[in-house]
């Protein structure tokens, strides 16, 4: 029944929707431990996708409830929303997840109003919360003081983080982890009587792994510390290795990985702790990595508008070959690209706008195995014309006039995705040394194989559609032809019927819409003959249809790949199990 309500009541209804979302978010997250202990890997993948979709589902539910219960005259009167915002601030002030509650309020407002009404008076364009809580440590950590005896501290850690499944071989792992720590750290650190180990109390879960995350520190220095744990079915829990290198820990929290499942009592304080471990990571990345991708989006937007306000940076077209479906531009001083869908595609492309959007959503929900760049979707970005180089703006207006619109001295971008900027692989190889070329092409092949084992076929595997990250990893970022591997029909090219067949410009055999012939990959992927030969040595099995068919068979049997986001001390073949 439609009724009148004071601002405080509307604020309470919005907050009630947030509480419902947070409760279900925690419920999904809390199940991660049991899924890890019971080796329920497919259930873990489903839970990850369910949690990603939960936010939009609950926003839609809350907006529908507000519309059903309140008169449009008061709900949709934008002049009332500064008062509603003030009432909401009072209601979230004592919460431990107040910054997430602000972002929720923004989502509800945008579900009710067009983006023309966005202002800091009606919603939280700028946060009212402190950016980092000024606490010396996270609210729930465990601290161990080895006093020169690392082994004793490790034994206590093994005891404190026990699971309901026993360790596979506790003594073996203790000896190995102790040896690895002594190997990774200077000898004086291990013997320092003031050395301390601080670990976050909650375990981080993702895919088939669990992670203890924290730091080693002395009064003068600190090192990040991560213990990856595995559960080998029928073998129990094992400590796989120990990581103390900041670059390697950064990769574990990479934008190319799925989001962690971790109990987070105070999100801002956990993020502040992680920020101290990984100072090179932006707050947006850290919030996103622990599942709060909408908060990551808010932090990204605030960083973007601050960058534009405080620098002379101007948008330019991104370097690389122009896309057939997407147009890509960037800010030189801001490590992000902005991708918009063109109005008209190259005739060789069979996709439409709706299909492209579906492909990006597929990537959002799927296990990215460290080989797909995460994206954020934005609507109705508004930037001053003065922030665009004239050539960039002219090109965007030409290729996407329905998406990029001039409104006086403002450029309206109706829809775009943001993505981490990388060096296109084809450009990287132009200036690479022989060793760098070999390493990049090897990682390019590994990227294709790991995506395939995760049931992803990139479709267009040209070098220009892959990027190289600052850590040297090869990542796929062009999604308009991406599909599930099991949807593809991998075939061998039939033998020619007559000698003339091989000379014909047209195939002598029928080709279905999902048919792929791996034998054709070498000439399509590599113009450079040296690169073609090298790749054949490194990953020649990618040219064999039987390799792809074998992967499809294992995927259909429900097997889930092990893809480790770190270098393992032992290097067994990746297992499908």
Swiss-Prot record:
EC number(s) given by UniProt: 2.7.11.5, 3.1.3.-
Highest rank taxon of the organism: Bacteria
One Pfam entry name: AceK_regulatory
Annotated GO MF terms: [isocitrate dehydrogenase (NADP+)] kinase activity; AMP binding; ATP binding; phosphoprotein phosphatase activity; protein serine/threonine kinase activity
Any GO BP annotation: glyoxylate cycle
Coiled-coil ranges (or none): none
Ligand binding (ATP): 318-324, 339
Active-site residues, record numbering mapped to chain: 374
Disulfide feature: none
Protein localization: Cytoplasm
Main location as per UniProt: cytoplasm
Function: Bifunctional enzyme which can phosphorylate or dephosphorylate isocitrate dehydrogenase (IDH) on a specific serine residue. This is a regulatory mechanism which enables bacteria to bypass the Krebs cycle via the glyoxylate shunt in response to the source of carbon. When bacteria are grown on glucose, IDH is fully active and unphosphorylated, but when grown on acetate or ethanol, the activity of IDH declines drastically concomitant with its phosphorylation.
Family to which the UniProt record says this protein belongs: Belongs to the AceK family.
PANTHER family with a match to the protein in the record: ISOCITRATE DEHYDROGENASE KINASE_PHOSPHATASE, PTHR39559
Official protein name in the record: Isocitrate dehydrogenase kinase/phosphatase
Designated gene of the protein: aceK
